[in-house]
C-alpha cells in the first residue's frame, strides 16, 4: 500500500510519507521536510506529521489540515 495520497492532509498523519512535501491550499506555501520551517524554527529533516499541533502555515496562518500533498 502506498503512503502517498491525493488531496488535503485533513490530519491523517498515518497516510503521509516522511519525505512528503505538502502545499497550503490557501496561499500555495510548500512545507518541505528537507528544508524545515525557519519561521516556526522547525529543523530540516522534520516530517510534516511530526510538526507540533499548533503549527500553522507560516505565510498565511492557515490551518495545517488545509495542506495538500504535492505529487511531483
From Swiss-Prot:
CDD domains: rubredoxin (cd00730). Coiled coil: none annotated. GO terms for molecular function: electron transfer activity; iron ion binding. Residues 19-70 form the Rubredoxin-like domain. It holds the Pfam family Rubredoxin. InterPro entries: Rubredoxin-like_dom (IPR024934), Rubredoxin_dom (IPR024935), Rubredoxin_ET (IPR050526), Rubredoxin_Fe_BS (IPR018527). The keyword Methyltransferase does not apply. Keywords: Electron transport, Iron, Metal-binding, Transport. The keyword Metal-binding applies. GO terms for biological process: alkane catabolic process. Fe cation binds at residues 24, 27, 57, 60. Its cofactor is Fe(3+). Binds 1 Fe(3+) ion per subunit. Could be an electron transport intermediate in hydrogen oxidation. PANTHER family: RUBREDOXIN, RUBREDOXIN-1-RELATED. Belongs to the rubredoxin family. This is Rubredoxin in uptake hydrogenase operon. It comes from Azotobacter chroococcum mcd 1. The gene is hupR.
Amino acid at each position: 500500500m502506498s503512503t502517498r495520497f491525493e488531496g488535503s492532509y485533513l490530519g491523517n498523519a498515518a497516510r503521509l510519507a516522511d519525505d512528503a512535501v505538502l502545499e497550503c491550499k490557501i496561499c500555495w506555501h510548500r512545507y518541505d521536510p528537507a528544508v524545515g520551517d525557519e519561521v516556526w524554527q522547525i529543523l530540516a529533516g522534520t516530517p510534516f506529521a511530526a510538526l507540533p499541533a499548533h503549527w500553522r502555515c507560516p505565510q498565511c496562518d492557515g490551518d495545517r489540515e488545509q495542506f495538500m500533498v504535492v505529487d511531483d
